[in-house]
Swiss-Prot record:
Main localisation: plastid
Protein name (database record): Large ribosomal subunit protein uL22c
Keywords of this entry: Chloroplast, Plastid, Ribonucleoprotein, Ribosomal protein, RNA-binding, rRNA-binding
Coiled-coil segments on the chain, per record: none
SUPFAM superfamilies cross-referenced by the UniProt entry: Ribosomal protein L22
Family: Belongs to the universal ribosomal protein uL22 family.
UniProt record, GO biological process: translation
Amino acid sequence: MGTDNKSKVEARASARYFKMSANKARRVINQIRGRSYEQALILLEFMPYRACYAILQLISSAAANANHNLGLSRANPFISEAKVDESTLFKRFQPRAQGRGYPIHKPTCHITITMIEKT
């Protein structure tokens, strides 16, 4: 029932307005959530999705933030939180026959990675 007042040292990195639907990014994020830094890099290297490269860069950025800002080693961080939130839609129109225009919605999302050191 008591609350734990220990403050966890965590490093975070986020990509905002990433031009991909949230569902496609979640497909990749769900595979790496809770894994170690090395395991996540190996998984992302061999997954065939377009979101993998951006998430790989984001994980590398979070590890660099942990190393530079908090002094944590790169040997044993793991991904404690990984989330994808929907963002705004970019609305465009595709010209069609006889003066019509069809709406095109280009979805974006926000990706956030939080890493802590595994003890």
